């Protein structure tokens, strides 16, 4: 896996080019508790999302003909089914914007790892195109569009670390400690259907206020069930636990260990077995995507936008 982190230098060095590259940050679930199962089968939860300064890159170049042209490094996925393409089309439909875009995804995050890659890609497309096309939708409106693409898309749209409740739609922004993490992807993919159908999955963890959860040991209710079904995840987690507190993110397959500083995380990373892909990154309570949008706004960059093309419909 390509191993570099987002930074201001990486963001600022590209500004003079015709294309802009926007970060699609990973996320981790610092904790995840399942509090109930609704009659419709959906599970209610309490979870804490934090972004990482590591992820995919989405390159964007504006077109004047309204076409959305996407190239990516994801095999066997039609563009029409890609969340990036769908996000761009939904934004056009919502705003009546007549501009288009050339989009290229530099895929770095592991697919199916539970670190939010697809949701982050969709959110970056929405937020970045809203900025570049000057469609001026609010984040709440973009989040509503994003919810059509996936339950986790809104948290990436808002770009702040968040405590999520319900089925993930109730968000409370917060500021957990920004630690360093070593994230590993075992050589397996998780079936969420298998996990959520397992009778041993906890479904009645008592709801607790955020203030209490933040000072309690963080756990993931899905972890034991995932480990029972996937020995590869159990092995990877066991390896991480030699170095630091570690657990599953989401339903996996990625697992992560938390460290107080980068040096300790990098030291463990150097010992990583070759069969694991992984990366070291710092948690951040403000999404690198939103940091870049803010940077562009502060620099007052003059983007080559055609005149009179912003139609709100």
From Swiss-Prot:
Gene3D superfamilies assigned to the protein according to its UniProt record, in alphabetical order: 3.30.230.10, GHMP kinase, C-terminal domain (3.30.70.890)
Q: What is its EC number?
A: 2.7.1.148
One Gene Ontology term of the molecular function aspect = ATP binding
Q: Which domain of life is it from?
A: Bacteria
The record ties this protein, via Pfam families, to: GHMP_kinases_C, GHMP_kinases_N
Alphabetically ordered keywords of this record: ATP-binding, Isoprene biosynthesis, Kinase, Nucleotide-binding, Transferase
Class of enzymatic activity (EC top level): transferase
Pathway, per record? Isoprenoid biosynthesis; isopentenyl diphosphate biosynthesis via DXP pathway; isopentenyl diphosphate from 1-deoxy-D-xylulose 5-phosphate: step 3/6
Tell whether ATP-binding is among the UniProt keywords.
yes
Enumerate the residues binding ATP: 110-120
Q: Which family does it belong to?
A: Belongs to the GHMP kinase family. IspE subfamily.
- Designated name of the protein: 4-diphosphocytidyl-2-C-methyl-D-erythritol kinase
Q: Which organism is it from?
A: Histophilus somni (strain 129Pt) (Haemophilus somnus)
What gene name is given for the protein in this entry?
A: ispE
């Amino acid at each position: 896996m390509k191993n570099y982190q987002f930074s201001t230098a990486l963001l600022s060095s590209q500004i003079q080019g015709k294309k802009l590259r926007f970060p699609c940050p990973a996320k981790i679930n610092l904790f995840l508790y399942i509090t109930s199962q609704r009659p419709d089968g959906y599970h209610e939860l309490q979870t804490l999302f934090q972004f990482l300064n590591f992820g995919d890159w989405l390159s964007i170049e504006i077109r004047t003909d309204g076409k959305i042209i996407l190239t990516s490094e994801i095999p066997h996925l039609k563009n029409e089914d890609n969340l990036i393409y769908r996000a761009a089309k939904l934004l056009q439909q919502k705003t009546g914007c007549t501009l288009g875009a050339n989009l290229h995804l530099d895929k770095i995050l592991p697919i199916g790892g539970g670190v939010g890659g697809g949701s982050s890609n969709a959110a970056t497309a929405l937020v970045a195109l809203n900025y570049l096309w000057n469609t001026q939708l609010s984040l709440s409106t973009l989040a509503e569009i994003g919810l059509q693409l996936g339950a986790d898309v809104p948290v990436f749209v808002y770009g702040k670390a968040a405590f999520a409740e319900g089925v993930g739609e109730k968000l409370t922004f917060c500021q957990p400690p920004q630690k360093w993490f070593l994230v590993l992807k075992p050589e397996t993919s998780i079936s969420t259907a298998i996990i959520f159908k397992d009778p041993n999955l906890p479904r009645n963890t008592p709801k607790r206020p955020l203030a209490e959860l933040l000072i309690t040991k963080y756990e993931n209710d899905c972890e034991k069930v995932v480990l029972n079904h996937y020995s590869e995840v159990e092995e990877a987690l066991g390896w991480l636990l030699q170095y630091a507190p570690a657990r599953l993110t989401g339903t996996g397959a990625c697992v992560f260990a938390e460290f107080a500083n980068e040096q300790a995380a990098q030291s463990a990373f150097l010992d990583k077995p070759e069969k694991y892909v992984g990366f070291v990154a710092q948690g951040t309570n403000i999404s690198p995507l939103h940091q870049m949008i803010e940077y562009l706004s502060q620099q007052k960059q003059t983007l080559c936008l055609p005149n009179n093309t912003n139609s709100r419909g």
